[in-house]
Amino acid sequence: MRDPVSSQYSSFLFWRMPIPELDLSELEGLGLSDTSTYKIQDSSAAKMTGKAPGAEQEKNPEGDALLEYSTFNFWRAPIASIHSFELDLL
């Protein structure tokens, strides 16, 4: 069994820089006045209520102004475009 005292300081979570708090006034300055969408949700509270983290997003069908900058869309490989003449070669 590992010694909890020595493993505490070798942890990545102990030595990394803390994530800064989000200043909601900066979002309002960018024109995103509806800051209720961007509030931090506690995952344990979501587990207790039985709601999935994405359930609130499904309630908002008009879309999100920052949706194109989500981590999934930003870091995924672009979809390859296949033209009709390339398809004929297959």
Curated annotation (Swiss-Prot):
PTM annotation, UniProt: Ubiquitinated, leading to degradation.
Coiled coil feature spans: none
PTM annotation (Phosphoserine): residues: S84
Intervals of motif Nuclear export signal: 24-32
Primary site of residence: nucleus
Subcellular location as annotated: Nucleus; Cytoplasm; Cytoplasm, Cytoskeleton, Microtubule organizing center, Centrosome
Superkingdom of the organism of origin: Eukaryota
Keywords in alphabetical order: Cytoplasm, Cytoskeleton, Nucleus, Phosphoprotein, Ubl conjugation
Functional description taken from the UniProt entry: Cofactor for the transcription factor TCF7. Involved in regulation of lymphoid development by driving multipotent hematopoietic progenitor cells towards a T-cell fate.
Similarity comment: Belongs to the MLLT11 family.
Subunit structure: Interacts with HSPA8 and LAMP2 isoform A; the interaction may target MLLT11 for degradation via chaperone-mediated autophagy. Interacts with TCF7.
Protein name: Protein AF1q
Species: Bos taurus
